[in-house]
A protein has these predicted regions:
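Canonical Rossmann dinucleotide-binding motif of NAD(H)/NADP(H)-dependent dehydrogenases/reductases
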Residues: 1-26
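Substrate-binding pocket helix/loop in short-chain dehydrogenase/reductase
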Residues: 74-87, 172
């Protein structure tokens, strides 16, 4: 039995589809309307109702995938309330769902948190999203220690992932060390691996899947690039 937050679209939908193809039952919570539990992940009573629904229907949780993304706004425009909302969706909800499901995790259970390569690097005006992704990356190893012996907890940091089924070419692709932009299946495949027995010796770890983008150092003058301060 698999729970996927933000599973109605993008990476989350691909993760849910891959689990279903493997024969698993999947419960999704998403703010987008559809044939799943619809609700706001920043709302405590909503999280509690969702958890009660899952446990009432299945009695256990094998895998929890905290995938839902928070809003991206920067210091110039992001309000206090928006920043708080980003952290509620991106950090508090994963923590609270893990807490709610803790008594109901099955033997061999796993939690996979979807962070971002922005947990280690930034663009201007992305503070709300970057802070949330950095928070869930740190939450991962904290939960792994607290749940040791019961649940394995890991996180994945995707880089540039094309969630619109478009084929980017030219500089968008060649700037990646692997020569292409990522796709949702690149992330879903790792999620399923981390939930499998093959990953039984992995916990508290973060895996960056970004085509090598964060490993490439670029200086002024490299590849025709120049800095404009």
């Amino acid at each position: 039995m698999v729970v996927v937050t933000g599973g109605a679209q993008g990476i989350g939908r691909c993760i849910a589809d891959e689990f279903r193809r493997s024969g698993a039952s999947v419960c999704i919570i998403d703010c987008q309307e559809g044939d799943h539990f619809v609700g706001d992940l920043s709302d405590k009573p909503t999280l509690e109702r969702f958890a009660q629904s899952v446990v009432g229907q299945y009695g256990r949780v094998d895998y929890l995938i905290n995938n839902a993304a928070s809003l991206m706004k920067g210091i110039d425009e992001c309000t206090f309330e928006e920043f708080q909302y980003a952290l509620s969706v991106g950090v508090t909800a994963p923590f609270y769902l893990t807490k709610l499901f803790a008594p109901h995790f099955a033997e061999g259970a796993a939690v996979v948190n979807i962070s971002s390569s922005r947990d280690r690097m930034s663009q201007p005006q992305t503070e709300s999203y970057t802070a949330a992704k950095g928070g869930i990356a740190a939450l991962t190893h904290a939960l792994a220690v607290s749940l040791a012996g019961r649940v394995r907890v890991n996180s994945i940091s995707p880089g540039w992932i094309d969630t619109k089924a478009m084929n980017y070419t030219g500089p968008d692709a060649t700037q990646q060390l692997v020569g292409r932009v990522g796709n949702p299946a690149d992330i879903a495949n790792m999620v399923l691996f981390l939930c499998s027995d093959k990953a039984g010796f992995i916990s508290g770890e973060n895996i960056c899947i970004d085509g090598g983008m964060t490993r490439q150092m670029i200086y002024h003058g490299d590849f025709g690039w120049s800095f404009r301060g």
